[in-house]
Amino acid sequence: DMVKKYDLFLFSDEVYREFVYGGEKLMSLLQLEGYEDNVVVIDSVSKRFSACGARIGCIISKNKELMNHCMKYAQARLSVATLDQIASAALYDVGPEYFAAVRDEYKLRRDTVVEELNKIPGIVFECPKGAFYLMAALPVDDAEKFQLFMLEEFDDNGDTLMFTPAESFYKTPHTGVNEIRMAYVINQDALKRSMELL
């Protein structure tokens, strides 16, 4: 309602829309009736297809004036290499079985991380319903200091653990100081070992 009342743009980052684990279909905001001039969808080849380094994405809107401005900006900028554009376009020819297989694998990995985290006292988190990462509050005062300890001092048979302190994901200062972001992008055994190290 605020979008219409104040004539705002509603941006929707939909790069993970295929990676929802409950079986439900995620609706695109482009499907909202009456918001055609307000909705702007962002998509990315690198995230959708795990194509790290493919700096190709798109902006989608039914707002012709906005898209005209976007095209002017795009024409003034250098673009991605032609070969990368061709390769990225080919990725969109994959069938739904690709996303089903990737989704199933990420769900297995998520379930492994959740199962192992539940064994650790004092960790607080929500089980993600999509994407391939989760945020967790650790029973520490400062996740960044804990990360430095893990990298500089901790060693278990030559292994340690690296994660992303979550404070930088928040706009409000001092929020998420004891939180970490973990991406479950490695195999099951490595995930189990990582949770053991944590």
Which functions belong to the PLM regions below?
Residues 1-198:
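PLP-dependent class I/II
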